A protein has these predicted regions:
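Catalytic cores of peptidoglycan-degrading enzymes
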Residues: 130-257
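Intrinsically disordered, low-complexity Ser/Thr-rich linker and spacer segments
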Residues: 94, 126-131
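Alpha-helical oligomerization segments with coiled-coil/rod-like character
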Residues: 1-122
Length: 257
């Protein structure tokens, strides 16, 4: 009877031990399944992230290509405008030189030659912007949002400055000159370009409207456009460049008045 009792106890103990092992194995199986599900979820998340990155890279490259194309169109438009205005610019440069010759001749004779108002205007608008020393007007009063040389996208950098201003504010010519371009350009909106002589020009983009047309003579501080957001930017602002011999240069050293 004692033997039979021990055997029953052993059987019960073994059964309990077996059930415990089965329970542990079941728990382990559940844990493995849960871990597998987590791994699968992590893999799917990683795939989504990689797909998103790939899409973002492609979108960035597409945007970069578009910006390069916009910049190329701007250069080509300016070159065409310069070519169209070349004959007049050369004629005015010769006339301005003739006035300077008169002044020099008078000086040699110990007298002075006083240019007429038209001659003074001619010399001013064909004499270039000179060395940058803060002598030019600010094109608009506002907050500088982007500076020359800052990163625009990828390897592209800002070729000018962006000034945030109230919509409809007057955009003013920074110096005397003649308008050679007033047109819509992709990426820059409504653009006005003023030629100042000697290869210098100023460019005003993102405008709501232009107050001048090609061929208009402008004076320093004269309103030439109204601030807008035609370049596709989120807020009203002015895109402003100075170009010297076709190359964009930092405009800020010229601006002071």
């Amino acid at each position: 009877t004692l033997f039979r009792s021990q055997t029953r106890e052993e059987v019960a103990s073994q059964k309990a031990e077996l059930e415990e092992k089965q329970s542990q194995q079941q728990t382990l199986l559940y844990d493995q399944q849960a871990q597998q599900e987590k791994l699968e979820q992590a893999r799917n998340e990683r795939k989504k992230t990689l797909a998103g990155l790939e899409s973002s890279i492609q979108a960035g490259q597409s945007q970069l290509s578009e910006m390069r194309a916009n910049e190329s169109r701007l250069r080509n438009s300016i070159a065409r405008a310069e070519a169209a205005a070349k004959a007049r610019a050369e004629k005015e440069a010769r006339e301005a030189q003739a006035v300077r010759n008169k002044q020099q001749e008078a000086s040699r004779k110990g007298t002075t030659y006083k240019p007429t108002e038209n001659e003074r205007s001619l010399m001013s608008r064909t004499g270039g912007l000179g060395s940058p020393r803060g002598q030019a007007y600010w094109p608009v009063r506002g907050t500088i949002l982007h500076r020359y040389g800052e990163q625009l996208q990828g390897e592209l950098r800002w070729k000018g400055i962006v000034i945030g201003a109230s919509e409809g504010s007057e955009v003013k010519a920074i110096a005397d000159g003649r308008v050679i371009l007033a047109d819509w350009l992709q990426g820059y909106g409504l653009v006005v370009v003023v030629e100042h002589g000697k290869g210098d020009m100023s460019l005003y983009g993102y405008n709501q409207s232009a107050l001048v047309s090609v061929g208009t003579q402008v004076r320093a501080g004269q309103p030439i456009a109204l601030v807008g957001s035609s370049g596709g930017q989120g807020r009203p602002s002015l895109y402003f460049e100075i170009r010297r011999q076709g190359q964009a240069v930092n405009p800020q050293p010229w601006l002071g008045r």
